[in-house]
Amino acid sequence: MASGKFITFEGIDGAGKTTHLQWFCERLQAKLAAGGRQVVVTREPGGTQLGEKLREILLNQPMDLETEALLMFAARREHLALVIEPALARGDWVVSDRFTDATFAYQGGGRGLPRDKLETLERWVQGGFQPDLTVLFDVAPQVASERRGAVRMPDKFESESDAFFSRTRGEYLRRAEEAPHRFAIVDATQSIPEIRQQLERVLAAL
């Protein structure tokens, strides 16, 4: 199928993943340049014209739990069809700020939506497709909360309680335990230079 690679960055809000995403992608691009491959940087929800409109709704409007999950997967189907799959088919590498693990963590772990419902949607939308690598930025909810409080006005998810993020983090770690071959866990409690040292090791292994 695809000759490119698909990498995702995951973690609870405030873990710092977005802070390091551009840095990581610049170094990955330098590594791939000799082979003529490009790094496509994208995000979920979002990444397409429709996806960005759905992102605005999902992050700011209250809604039924199942509606939220369905919209997440609708945006994902569009993202796969228009961005991810074509890029991989060209031989490019794709790095996405969140993917399906986030839905299991947030809508499943955080919101409590039954896992079997999410698995049904996952099979329908993406079949057996999974990231080649998921970089999970792991941090305690209390630390993440302090970081979120230091930035802009929070969206709907960023405003959730520490208890919500504790459940979300727990689901992320459970998924990492189930698929250790796919996950690289970054200790996101460390300083920016220390986190980048961890990411350098991830890059070296690619």
UniProtKB/Swiss-Prot annotation:
**Catalytic reaction list:** dTMP + ATP = dTDP + ADP
Q: Indicate the enzyme's highest-level EC class.
A: transferase
Q: Which UniProt keywords apply?
A: ATP-binding, Kinase, Nucleotide biosynthesis, Nucleotide-binding, Transferase
BP term (GO), one: dTDP biosynthetic process
Binding residues annotated for ATP, in chain numbering: 11-18
Record GO cellular component, one term? cytosol
- Listed GO MF terms: ATP binding; dTMP kinase activity
Q: What is its EC number?
A: 2.7.4.9
Which InterPro entries does the annotation name?
P-loop_NTPase, Thymidylate_kin-like_dom, Thymidylate_kinase
Q: What does this protein do?
A: Phosphorylation of dTMP to form dTDP in both de novo and salvage pathways of dTTP synthesis.
| Family, similarity comment | Belongs to the thymidylate kinase family.
HAMAP family this protein is in?
A: Thymidylate_kinase
**Official protein name in the record:** Thymidylate kinase
Gene this protein is translated from:
tmk
